[in-house]
Amino acid sequence: MAKSRRSRRRRKSSSSVGDFIKVFAILIVIVSIIAGGFFVWWNQENIETNKSDLCPTDGARATVAILLDTTDDIAPVTKTDIQNRTAKLLNELPRFYRVSLYTLNEDGLNPTPIATLCNPGRLDEMGKLERDGYTANPQMIKDKYSKFQQNMSKAIDQTLGQKFDAQQSPLLGSLQNLSLLLPKPVALDAEKYLAGTNKIILISDLLEFTPVYSMYVQNTNLKSFQNSKAGEKFGKQYDEDIEIWQVQRNRLGISNKKLKKLWLDIFDKEFGYSIYRDPPLTITPLVGLE
């Protein structure tokens, strides 16, 4: 009888230990699931973006505005050079920067961009968790970046495919107006996605031609500009970085090198865009001659 009671106690004790181990194991699993879920949640990117332009809902870190002068036609080889340069620009654009394509005609700046999209980021720019699909959808990342690349490239190609012609070329006024339109850069966080600086890339032959100032009529030197009303009308202190891709032309003996120097002088002496600014104003001659 005593032996039977001892056996029952041993079985009961063994059963209690087994139950404890099961409960402990279940708790370990639950804690692991909660910890794993918290880790995934903590590492998920919480920057919301718009479906239409792929830009953060809070705003882009900066805008790169391409301003295409459509007042005179461009040689096919020059158009190809522009396409190659813009493709490189799109590939190197930082994540959550906006790129917008604007045009100017004889009436000035068209304030509505032909296309405007933000770089949502390439998959190879993401962390391992995103690439492996734990905290993001890799295919969705690829699809968004493909939309950004293809839509912007298509807009540039279609715009360059048009015939350009106009009675005047209001370049300085268009630059001035575009500068006033660009939204202020936004910092998305304090470490990884800081606010940048807006940038305008002007693609033009630099031949300003308006009733206020004409580089066809007046000499291509700073004195002729200063003697006109152009400084008063078009003058502006630019916070944006300015870059110019110069379309080469052979017009009325006007030297492309003199045009380049004149624009550098105008920005330095009249617009306060110092030659010592970082980055400085750059004027890059495009391939071809029209």
Mark where each language-model region is.
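DG-centered beta-turn motif at the end of beta-strands
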Residues: 68-71, 178, 196-209
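Sec-exported extracytoplasmic/periplasmic mature domains
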Residues: 87-95, 179-187, 208, 268, ...
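Von Willebrand factor
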Residues: 59-195, 200, 284
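Acidic/histidine-rich, surface-exposed loop or edge segments in extracytoplasmic proteins
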Residues: 60-73, 154-161, 242-248
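Acidic, polar low-complexity linker/tail segments
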Residues: 8-66, 71-78, 91, 227-229, ...
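Short acidic, S/G/P-rich loop/turn micro-motifs used as interaction or catalytic elements
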Residues: 71-75, 107-110, 207-214, 249-253
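Von Willebrand factor type A / integrin I
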Residues: 221-290
